[in-house]
Amino acid sequence: MTFDAFTKVVAQADARGEFLSDAQLDALSRLVAEGNKRIDTVNRITGNASSIVANAARALFAEQPSLIAPGGNAYTNRRMAACLRDMEIILRYVTYAVFTGDASILDDRCLNGLRETYLALGVPGASVAEGVRKMKDAAVAIVSDRNGITQGDCSAIISELGSYFDKAAAAVA
């Protein structure tokens, strides 16, 4: 079962039979203060998801044209659609992780066993990882645009966002 940050803190305090500590409350207060930034981040990525995936795939196939050549892993419309679907699923779970501030949903529901599945299907993990890195670059650029977003230092959330993409790329490579 996946727990959010609040549930984890309460479960830890309850297991010890203690009230929440000042340090725990301060940490949760900071998380709440960052909540609007998380929502803005997820909204921006979600609103641009189609272009993030399409542009990452386009750039990947431009760099690795053998993927879309006859016999390539993304050759035929069915395989191309599966590739785009998988990229979109990874992006979606990255947004869930950013929203909750917890990578476990990404690990448990998306990445767990993905490398093995790709190996069994003959999908080149290095190419998938490169596609994920291209989505990371696009998502970070979109989130880093300071126009129309909650003001303040967003470097921590941007770093966190990047770490989820890095985790996904490493999981499939």
Curated annotation (Swiss-Prot):
One of its GO terms (cellular component) is phycobilisome. (2R,3E)-phycocyanobilin 2 binds at residue 154. Its main location: membrane. Contains two covalently linked bilin chromophores. Heterodimer of an alpha and a beta subunit, which further assembles into trimers and the trimers into hexamers. Pfam families: Phycobilisome. It is a peripheral membrane protein. This is C-phycocyanin beta subunit. Gene3D superfamilies: Phycocyanins. The keyword Transport applies. Belongs to the phycobiliprotein family. CDD domains: PC_PEC_beta. (2R,3E)-phycocyanobilin 1 binds at residue 83. The modification N4-methylasparagine is found at residue 73. It comes from the Bacteria. Keywords: Antenna complex, Bile pigment, Chromophore, Electron transport, Membrane, Methylation, Photosynthesis, Phycobilisome, Thylakoid, Transport. Light-harvesting photosynthetic bile pigment-protein from the phycobiliprotein complex (phycobilisome, PBS). Phycocyanin is the major phycobiliprotein in the PBS rod. It comes from Synechococcus elongatus (strain ATCC 33912 / PCC 7942 / FACHB-805). The gene is cpcB1. It is found in: Cellular thylakoid membrane. GO terms for biological process: photosynthesis. InterPro entries: Globin-like_sf (IPR009050), Phycobilisome_asu/bsu (IPR012128), Phycobilisome_asu/bsu_sf (IPR038719), Phycocyanin_b (IPR006247).
